[in-house]
Amino acid sequence: MAAILAERGWRVIDVDLVGHRVLREPEARELVAGRFGPGVLSADGEVDRKELSRRVFRSREELAALEGIVHPRMVERVREELAVTPEPAVLNAAVLFRMGLDRLCSAVLCVRAPWWVRLARARRRDGLALAQGLRRIAAQRGICPKLHAAGVDIYYINNGSGVDALREGTLRLLREKGLEL
């Protein structure tokens, strides 16, 4: 979805990459190592994201602890990036609502796909074992709230049929809702 919008001229802020940068910040790195142990640091002192992921996706409490450390910093970095220029931007964020980033949006395009499609994609993209992929899918449960629960317009797009169908549906939605640049 983000790539399709970027092709249409939208500025894309990849919130996952913002999180990677936050984990390289000394204060966040120290808090993460203090909470999850020195085993989450690589030999060069950086956060080993694969090891950290392995640990936090085992329980909701561990994931919540990590989110408590990094999400506030990520939100601040996103705000800083948005302030750089007034041009419209896309926030590409799997947990947009959980982070409260929806409050910065005028509209949300929520991409849906069956869990087994998302699982296969995550395993292929990230090289995850089946159990790891299932834990990640479970952690993302409920990331798109009901239409009436959010303070922003939410538009759902199905991504279960491949990139061509996603592109067609996205462009149609942008035209219909007047969201084109």
Q: What name fits each language-model region?
A:
Residues 17-20, 96, 161-163:
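Short histidine/acidic/glycine/proline-rich micro-motifs that form metal-
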Residues 17-20, 113-116, 136-139:
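Short, acidic/turn-prone active-site loops that include or flank metal/cofactor-
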Residues 77, 103-104, 124-176, 180-181:
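Small-molecule kinase domains that catalyze NTP-dependent phosphoryl transfer to phosphate-bearing small molecules
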Residues 11, 17, 107, 153-155:
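Well-ordered beta-strand positions
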Residues 76-83, 89-124:
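ATP-dependent NMP and nucleoside kinases share a basic, alpha-helical "lid"
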Residues 17-86:
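ATP-dependent small-molecule kinase phosphotransfer cores
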Residues 1-13:
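A conserved segment at the C-terminal end of the G1
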